[in-house]
Amino acid sequence: MVETLYSNELICSYVDFKNTTDQHKFIFSFRGKMSHAVVKNLLSMAEKKIDALQEAETVKKKIFGVMINCLQTICTEAKEMGSSTDSIFLISKDSAGFTVFAGRNLLSRMAHKLSELIDEVNQLDRNSLLDLHKEKLKELQKLSESFTIDETILSLIEIAKRSGQRINYLIEETEADNVFFSIKIQIN
């Protein structure tokens, strides 16, 4: 008896997936739970992939810095964020530069708090970002009860500083108290 090792449906889904990644020019993607070990491995793999593209060192540093902060802020497991579901992390490259995408399911209230922090960061110029960064570092040293909020805003400030761009975000309703929260950062 001959065993079927594949089906047309599987091949079609692979072809659809490949066409989608090619169309959007994704060079790196991951979907799953983000443990510390997974984050380390993702950073290592993405670094090798970007090195192979032979980009300028300044661009590599920007991308790597944004990646680290996205993975720490948006993707990693945190009880405070109100989610233990899979995260998604993507990098694409086109003629305009690189785009980093990160997202995960969150409780609605946490997503709205995160969007408020991003809106606050997006309104600041570079000097104001530096001032806010210093202020939050001082607050963090006091180990206040807003520890995770201060860590989050520090990561968002780093993303804005390194990319030199606004942080774009999207909140999509998924179910009762949950939303899918994603960010998109352009790096030139």
Regions found by a protein language model. Give the residues of each.
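Glycine-rich/acidic phosphate-handling loop/turn and adjacent ATP-lid/helix
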Residues: S95-D150
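Conserved ATP-binding N-box helix of the HATPase_c
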Residues: E57-S92, I157-R162
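N-terminal intrinsically disordered, cationic/polar leader segments
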Residues: E3-F17, G97-T99
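Helix-loop-beta hinge of the Bergerat
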Residues: T20-Q54, N122-K134
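Glycine-rich ATP-binding loops of the HATPase_c
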Residues: Q165-I171
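Short C-terminal beta-strand
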Residues: V179-N188
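Short beta-strand element(s) in the Bergerat
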Residues: F26, A96-V100, F181
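Conserved short strand/loop->alpha-helix "switch" segment adjacent to the catalytic nucleotide/phosphoryl-transfer site
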Residues: S44-I68, Q141-S146
